Amino acid sequence: MDKKSRVLIVGGTGFIGKRIVKASLALGHPTYVLFRPEALSYIDKVQMLISFKQLGAKLLEASLDDHQGLVDVVKQVDVVISAVSGGLVRHHILDQLKLVEAIKEAGNIKRFLPSEFGMDPDVVEDPLEPGNITFIDKRKVRRAIEAATIPYTYVSSNMFAGFFAGSLAQLQDAPRMMPARDKVLIYGDGNVKGVYVDEDDAGIYIVKSIDDPRTLNKTVYIRPPMNILSQKEVVEIWERLSGLSLEKIYVSEDQLLNMKDKSYVEKMARCHLYHFFIKGDLYNFEIGPNATEGTKLYPEVKYTTMDSYMERYL
């Protein structure tokens, strides 16, 4: 059996980071979790780190501002996976440029996976402001990786089900992370196809890609065939499972893009909803020669369908 790569996860206490840590351990990789000194001020993060340690992970403390400390950490592993936050509130994508410099100096990393895990920033054309900052920053990190000739894999895991299926995409202004029981906003005509992925499944696909020569210097799109669904189809799944009949309130493109008097976070959310549910930027393109698809690479992974996923909300 081939020796498993030693994996360092940066941002391992975050929403997707903790799934990557658990997937790495489950798949038998020697797993290292980098945590920043400030994480020790938060009891929930400390308890999560301890739980990783109890599962077999090695904890490493370092600041992204400590270049030599980062280099010393990177030299202990073979693969680096970054899961730093690129969210609407905490946006730290450009912090990864410090990680790129450390990896470049260390010179031993076989694969680097930057924090992506959503829409492919190189595919989305003319992203709306202010939501375009996510794509601009991710592109900067990609170009820095490529300029440094660091071996990479970019993973596009599309829409995390907890955010977009469980909420029925009710994220316009006042996010609701549980499925509605009375009425639901439908963006556009509700028929634009998107791709929904269980977060734990995403962690498995991400980790499986790190030692695979087929994913070297390529983008991996995770497109579970049964989870390529429109917003209306997800709503219909919930109605069928729950026995409810929801009132559908249709939100036009113009209404969605009316940013007047909206906060920065609300504007960011509306931009992403536009790209997902109006333009269809998750699924409106063919996978090219410099990319591949995760469920085809790893058919042994039994992914979670949205029918199954939504049962937890009953």
From Swiss-Prot:
Gene3D superfamilies: NAD(P)-binding Rossmann-like Domain, UDP-galactose 4-epimerase, domain 1. Keywords: NADP, Oxidoreductase. One of its GO terms (molecular function) is lariciresinol reductase activity. Substrate binds at H272. Pfam families: NmrA. GO terms for biological process: lignan biosynthetic process. Its EC number is 1.23.1.4, 1.23.1.3. The active site is at K138 (proton acceptor). Reductase involved in lignan biosynthesis. Catalyzes the enantioselective sequential conversion of (-)-pinoresinol into (-)-lariciresinol and of (-)-lariciresinol into (+)-secoisolariciresinol. Abstracts the 4R-hydride from the NADPH cofactor during catalysis. This is Bifunctional pinoresinol-lariciresinol reductase 3.
